Design a protein with these regions (language model features):
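Conserved catalytic cores of very large enzyme subunits
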Residues: 1-373, 393-394, 398-573
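Contiguous, well-ordered alpha-helical segments that form the cores/surfaces of helical PPI scaffolds
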Residues: 376-389, 410
Length: 574
């Protein structure tokens, strides 16, 4: 199985085992953060692709309240200089306030809690002294909770860049989705994960994991006055410095069709660098995100089909149909192999109820029925080179090439939709990342067909439907062109734009680009830009020849560290 979206809320409430002992529900945000990493690591050991937490702030918010409850009672004991005071009633009252209101840290619930605390403090203080100690107690508890939440988010980032999985081969390929939670607790989580990302790793390095996806939603975070607009601005600022978060757009029509207000499990999420699993033709009552994932995908080398068509579009389509049908057969074979497995073959994914409906199965049961909620995807690579081989231009160069490109991808989507209707399984179309295949396919084709200008004359085929990176085009035009393809690729797609200069100094421009992606129908997008780091003073930003902070020249001692998301992408598998 490729990748999965983990429901931490359900997992934490039940408690879970990694095979070496049972872990009960966490009682603080720090322990919840630690267990989230353990869940990702354990699930990764059963799979080869990405692990995603689709509702990060929703899942962890209850544990912010648990930490707050502890901190408040501890501060009261310190203020009263009485470690033995019984505060169980206060603990229960805060739990009830959270249950009734969905928040304990909002202004109106803080007022309710302050009334309770004031009565407790009245046993020792009165008048102005009572008011001063009440103010201190309430503010100090919030301060301690915020500090612990920051440390918890910092730990998530550090752990997911250091803890090993899959027999120690590599760190888990993790991603977290957030952006729409509006309670004080949810906002505290999002703010602090962004601040921890901004701070970087131990020596200031840019963290690669988890891949972070900020969910953009009109009325929630896209304009002044929206409850989370400040967090969207912060996300833009952090992404301008650290490359993450990326941005997913919940109002894209093909995402919005599943959205139910008040149900975050219906908000589209991303696994890894682009994978998307949402629609569910096997069981339309389970068109939700948590507990589902991609079973397998296979990528088609479109440029080879175009080369062999020798300019004949009809021959290309004939070859494409044969190839897609071959992939269908291969994916069905793959499905049968997976379906024949038992729960014990996936001790965490299935044994601990991560995968949807797997909690109904026994240890020796086969997993055939539950995996039908997953997806089987047909991927593709090199649309740009395909168009050059067929008509002499790619889709960034002419409108006619763009129309042909859209027709090709639309045709592939129609084939996957028909296969879904035929089999009852969730077949989908995937704009494959193909970090390895992009070089492998073109090298094989060079040996067979030689150097063909615009097709095999580079060391790679262009990613999925992207306009080639070497082609001189404005960011707006690239977004506008690629945005037309996103709705066709229901298994996932991403669009990048490459920006020059130090975006830290122009967050307004960064924001405009993100929102233009939204306006052009992009479902998932990212802005790529140079990120340099001075190894001497730790400055992060654009460094030409001289570090603007310490004045060190490149080449003096240790070389300046350079990172771009094009380099980061080569690790993507989800």
């Amino acid at each position: 199985i490729n990748c999965c979206q983990i429901d931490l809320t359900d997992l934490f409430r039940r408690g879970f085992s990694t095979g070496h002992g049972f872990l009960r529900e966490p009682q603080s945000i720090q322990s919840a953060a630690a267990l989230s990493c353990i869940a990702i690591q354990s699930n990764q050991n059963d799979m080869h692709g990405g692990q995603s937490i689709p509702m990060f702030e929703y899942d962890l918010a209850p544990y912010v309240v648990k930490s707050y409850n502890k901190h408040l009672r501890q501060v009261i004991k310190i203020v009263l200089r009485n470690d033995n005071i019984d505060l169980d009633d206060l603990k229960a009252a805060i739990e009830q306030i959270y249950k009734d209101n969905g928040t304990a840290l909002a202004d109106h619930t803080q007022e309710q809690i302050a009334v309770l605390v004031k009565e407790i403090l009245r046993s020792k203080f009165e008048g102005d002294e009572l008011e001063d100690n009440l103010s201190y107690t309430m503010s100090e508890a919030l301060k301690l909770t915020n500090r612990e939440t920051y440390q918890a988010m910092e730990a998530v980032i550090h752990n997911l860049n250091s803890m090993q999985s899959r027999a120690g081969a590599q760190v888990p390929f993790s991603s977290i989705n957030y952006g729409t939670g509006t309670t004080a607790e949810q906002r505290m989580i999002m703010k602090n994960v962004l601040l921890a990302t901004d701070a970087g790793l131990g020596s200031g390095e840019t963290p690669i994991f988890p891949v972070q996806i900020f969910k953009v939603k009109d009325g929630v975070n896209t304009k002044e006055g929206d409850p989370n607009y400040d967090l969207f601005r912060l996300a833009c600022k952090v992404s301008a410095k650290r490359l993450f978060p990326n941005f997913s757009f919940l109002d894209a029509p093909y995402n919005k069709q599943y959205y139910v207000e008040g149900h975050p499990e219906t908000e589209v999420a991303v696994m890894g660098c682009r994978t998307r699993v949402f629609g569910n033709d096997y069981d339309k009552t389970k068109q939700v995100i948590p507990g589902r994932g991609n079973l397998s995908f296979t990528t088609i080398n479109l440029p080879r089909l175009a080369i062999e068509a020798h300019g004949s579009i009809s021959k290309f389509y004939e070859s494409l149909d044969r190839m897609v049908n071959m992939v269908f057969e291969q994916l069905l074979d793959r499905f049968e192999i997976i379906a024949d497995k038992h729960v014990y073959n996936y001790p965490f994914l299935m044994g601990q109820g991560i995968w949807i409906d797997s909690y109904r199965l026994h240890w020796d049961d086969k997993i055939r029925d539950v995996i039908k909620n997953g997806s089987l995807s047909v991927g593709f690579i090199g649309l740009a080179e395909t168009l050059v081989a067929l008509v002499g231009q790619h889709h960034g160069e002419s409108q006619s090439a763009l129309e042909l490109g859209l027709n090709i991808i639309r045709h592939m989507r129609e084939l996957t939709d028909k296969q879904t209707q035929k089999t009852g399984l969730n077949f989908s179309l995937f704009s494959t990342p193909a970090e390895g295949l992009s070089g492998r396919f073109v090298n094989i084709d060079k040996k067979i067909y030689g150097i063909i200008p615009g097709v095999t004359d580079r060391s790679y085929y262009t990613n999925s439907f992207h306009v080639p990176v070497y082609y001189n085009i404005s960011a707006a035009d690239k977004i506008r062109i690629e945005g037309k393809f996103h709705e066709l690729c229901n298994a996932g797609a991403i669009s990048y734009v490459e920006m020059d200069g130090d975006l830290n100094k122009n967050i307004d421009a960064f924001e405009r680009v993100v929102l233009y992606m939204r306006d052009c129908g992009v479902g998932y997008g990212s802005i790529n830009h140079p990120v340099d780091r001075c190894p001497v003073c730790g400055y992060v930003g654009v460094i030409n020849d001289v570090c603007p902070k310490c004045g060190r020249k490149d080449g003096e001692g240790v070389t300046i560290e350079r990172l771009s998301k094009l380099g980061v992408d080569c690790i993507c598998r989800g």
